[in-house]
Amino acid sequence: MSPELIEEVRGVIAAYTPNECAQTASELQSIWLKAKPLESTPLIKREAREKLKAIGTPVPVLKAIGKEVGKAARKRVDDFLPLMQLLWDEYGREGRIVAATALHPMELAEPEMVIPFVRELARTSISWEDCDQLAMEALEPIVRKKPEKYLAALESWVRDENKWVQRAAVTVIGRLPMKRGEYTARCLEMIEPALGDPDRDVRRAVSFAIRMGARGDPAAVRTFIKKHSGSADPSVIWVMCDAMRSMTKKFLPQFKALLPVYERWLEVADAKSRRSIEGAIKALRK
């Protein structure tokens, strides 16, 4: 984003008061509209824009705006939460990305205030992108910084009735072992309640978490898969197969010993599950 637009954002935020949320949100929108690409630039398909109420402003621009908002908001978290709510609720995909990014420093400054707020925002996600941006920008920072204090709080999120709350938690839990390998076994245990979830968005997050666990402690992941090797639940089998099919190639050799597990699943699988299992077996045999 240009220095001129950055200065515009700073000016808008410097004048912000909680009683003027609508004006501030509108002024921020006018700034990101200036960075909107030409219609011919295929950054996001028209159908997706309509579904997400998206204009098509590039994500790096939106994140730059959000970071500037966050610099001021971290010093006045309570005052800025109404603006975050309005951006999330009323300003489409662009507003949600700006809000999620701004919440990053706000959460680090006031986690007890921001974490419950983020949970409620997650409930109203429109897409997996909303949910994942919120998880990684607005929830993950404090969990990664102080897992001994904040990780356990996500257990209830994993069991929430709302699929986006579940996905946000599983995403954050799953990413922790990337930097803190000693938490891998615990993180896998925490996502276990979502393993057989019927919703594909949740299952994809669980598969992602298993793959990220492989970066922290592959042995813990092997133990986790073996633990569920007797499951006949198609949802569980799909997750375990997707984890192998989508695993980073350099980690796959550490899971070849699990080939008999997948071969047994293939022997008893229904027709719907066979394709997933065959894909996992193919990946493990390479």
Regions found by a protein language model. Give the residues of each.
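Alpha-helical scaffold domains
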Residues: 1-286
